[in-house]
Regions:
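Ribonuclease/tRNase effector modules and their secretory precursors
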Residues: 1-80
Length: 80
């Protein structure tokens, strides 16, 4: 799948209440999680690929996982 599919549906990206606290904890951020992740998707330096049922976005030391059907941010964490 082409990453343009994710970019065309960026307005659908969201997460659940528990996802917000988990992602904030994993990344050590206090800002809006959804906007943070959308900005990483839009960043030209991000590596975006689809594997199975998920999209993966890698940017610097961060990896974000988004469900390809529902566009729910599943998790985000630092890459070690």
């Amino acid at each position: 799948m082409d990453k343009n599919e994710l970019l065309m549906n960026i307005y659908k990206i969201h997460t659940k209440h528990l996802g917000i606290s988990r992602i904030k904890r994993n990344l050590g951020i206090e800002e809006d999680v959804v906007e943070f992740c959308k900005n990483k998707v839009l960043d030209k330096k991000s590596l975006i690929y689809r594997k199975g049922k998920n999209w993966y976005i890698e940017n610097g030391a961060i990896k974000i996982t988004i469900n390809a059907t529902s566009y729910t941010i599943i998790t985000a964490h630092t890459i070690k």
